[in-house]
Curated annotation (Swiss-Prot):
Involved in calcium binding and microtubule stabilization. The gene is TCTP. The lineage of its organism: Eukaryota, Metazoa, Spiralia, Lophotrochozoa, Annelida. This is Translationally-controlled tumor protein homolog. Residues 1-167 form the TCTP domain. Keywords: Calcium, Cytoplasm. Induction: By cadmium. GO terms for molecular function: calcium ion binding.
Length: 167
């Protein structure tokens, strides 16, 4: 299995256990699905004596619903205005570009060329996207994007802002 981590804070964003495709050699498109996790509390863990006279009053099960990618990687929703997102993405793209020029100069030009149309598409349809960051919530990290296509959530991650770790 491959775990994809944010280059800057180093937190896990997703793994290859989800269907992943590469868009324009720059953006990973990851297909998620809505799921509900139910957490039941064992009555024995609460303690006390069960009454022989009364009826059973157990504890209620709690549940949490969300997108599997978000829940598995403990991503945190991050609300930004379009203007604030533009400020963040400019700074983030510069950081990625600088990192690429140090480590993979050949990829730097490809990244700059191919990422611009995707960013433009996101900005044109910004209200349709939700933003998520890794659990460290570092300001220098990637903001992953999620957009719903009907009943299916898709998350988008910048390929060049990720490190791959085989486990």
């Amino acid at each position: 299995m491959i775990i994809f981590k944010d280059v800057f804070p180093g937190v896990e964003l997703f793994s290859d256990s989800f269907p992943v495709s590469l868009v324009n050699e720059t953006v990973y498109k990851v297909k998620g699905k809505l799921r509900t996790d139910t957490f039941a509390i064992d009555d024995k863990a609460i303690g006390g004596n069960a009454s022989a006279e009364g009826g059973e009053e157990g504890t209620d099960a709690a549940s949490k619903q969300g997108v599997d990618i978000v829940m598995n990687s403990r991503l945190v929703e991050y609300a930004l205005s379009k203007k604030d997102y533009m400020t963040h993405i400019k700074s983030y793209m510069k950081s990625v570009k600088d990192k690429l020029q140090e480590t993979k100069p050949a990829d730097s030009e490809l990244f700059q060329k191919n990422v611009q149309p995707f960013i433009k598409e996101v900005l044109n349809d910004f209200k349709e996207y939700q933003l998520f960051c890794g659990e460290s919530m570092g300001p220098e990290g990637m903001l992953a994007l999620m957009k719903w296509d009907g009943e299916t959530p898709y998350m988008f991650f910048f390929k060049h802002g990720l490190d791959e770790e085989k486990v």
